[in-house]
Amino acid sequence: MTNIRKSHPLLKIVNNAFIDLPAPSNISSWWNFGSLLGICLIMQIMTGLFLAMHYTSDTTTAFSSVAHICRDVNYGWIIRYLHANGASMFFICLYIHVGRGLYYGSYAFLETWNIGIILLFTVMATAFMGYVLPWGQMSFWGATVITNLLSAIPYVGTTLVEWIWGGFSVDKATLNRFFAFHFILPFIIAALAGVHLLFLHETGSNNPTGISSDMDKIPFHPYYTIKDILGALLLILILLLLVLFSPDLLGDPDNYTPANPLNTPPHIKPEWYFLFAYAILRSIPNKLGGVLALILSILILAFIPLLHTSKQRSMMFRPISQCLFWTLVADLLTLTWIGGQPVEPPFIMIGQVASILYFSLILILMPVAGIIENHILKW
């Protein structure tokens, strides 16, 4: 008799994805972040659902409904802070996951990589709309500034912005539709993640060497299930330390002031995980140019498979490319820091240099390094 997990139509899918899946024997902890992203998504959907039960998406009551959740709802404060800081953990895992893909050449799986880019854009859109919902000062002005960027589109820009706003400024209609989108998008993300996994399992996982591991596979369970559980416990530990000891560490104090269209905060800035893109946007003096650079800062990931010049897939045995990769990481950290600083010297110049370096590294220096390494190895 065949085991039920191998014959049952539903259990068979779970079995082939998480139990009997043949996995490379040498994948490191950098491969843990896919499962951690799944855990983050489930946690965000669950906490978000409970928050939505008490939240009201009306400009007059949104701010006080969030205060009500924290003060009067049973364990509302922990649900709210798990959701807010869970988003930060989500992005930490996302950026590490993308970085892992860059370092080890996982972008060679084109379908998986491209759906990953779509997922990244969708998660960023969801997080942006979620930040608007508490209707604090930074929520309101962040929404105003970012949506206003669309007005840089020639001819249709202004009409497009007013269409998104549902009026002539960010108001009740905007908040209402942002809440609706913020509620539905995580389910779309879950569906896309399923497709992401589907395409990954067509090819099987990459591994640190970048060489085919077909001759040396081990079952996913128990080896990688136990490894993923350890990763999950560490993620939950860090999240709980953040939530229980300094829940507002990554937030903006301005968001504890109710939204006021008549009073602009001195420094409008998004959440920390968007600061690198915000710094790139601000470093270009032209509005349309800035918007294009902002979009390209993420969309550039789609061109990476085309820019791969090395005859080796992974960077594991490519020291020049490794140096450039870690320079890119340092550059992104610099951009993140600059994004949170006021627009004044020397920050303007640092931001411009870091932005140029970001695009130069990906478009020019890394492909050139691949060619040089091929010559060094006489390939």
From Swiss-Prot:
Amino acids binding heme b b566: 97, 196
Cofactor note: Binds 2 heme b groups non-covalently.
Membrane topology according to the record: Multi-pass membrane protein
A GO CC annotation given for this chain: respiratory chain complex III
Disulfide bonds: none
Annotated localization: Mitochondrion inner membrane
Residues that coordinate or bind a ubiquinone: 201
Pfam families xrefs: Cytochrom_B_C, Cytochrome_B
Necessary cofactors: heme b
Keyword hit for Magnesium: no
Residues that, per the record, bind heme b b562: 83, 182
Record key words, sorted: Electron transport, Heme, Iron, Membrane, Metal-binding, Mitochondrion, Mitochondrion inner membrane, Respiratory chain, Transmembrane, Transmembrane helix, Transport, Ubiquinone
Keyword Transport carried by entry: yes
Membrane-crossing residue ranges in chain numbering: 33-53, 77-98, 113-133, 178-198, 226-246, 288-308, 320-340, 347-367
SUPFAM superfamilies with a match to the protein in the record: a domain/subunit of cytochrome bc1 complex (Ubiquinol-cytochrome c reductase), Transmembrane di-heme cytochromes
Domain of life: Eukaryota
Primary localization class, coarse: mitochondrion
Molecular function per GO: metal ion binding; ubiquinol-cytochrome-c reductase activity
GO biological process per UniProt: mitochondrial electron transport, ubiquinol to cytochrome c
Subunit structure: The cytochrome bc1 complex contains 11 subunits: 3 respiratory subunits (MT-CYB, CYC1 and UQCRFS1), 2 core proteins (UQCRC1 and UQCRC2) and 6 low-molecular weight proteins (UQCRH/QCR6, UQCRB/QCR7, UQCRQ/QCR8, UQCR10/QCR9, UQCR11/QCR10 and a cleavage product of UQCRFS1). This cytochrome bc1 complex then forms a dimer.
Function: Component of the ubiquinol-cytochrome c reductase complex (complex III or cytochrome b-c1 complex) that is part of the mitochondrial respiratory chain. The b-c1 complex mediates electron transfer from ubiquinol to cytochrome c. Contributes to the generation of a proton gradient across the mitochondrial membrane that is then used for ATP synthesis.
Additional remarks: Heme 1 (or BL or b562) is low-potential and absorbs at about 562 nm, and heme 2 (or BH or b566) is high-potential and absorbs at about 566 nm.
Family recorded in the similarity comment: Belongs to the cytochrome b family.
Protein name, UniProt field: Cytochrome b
Gene (UniProt): MT-CYB
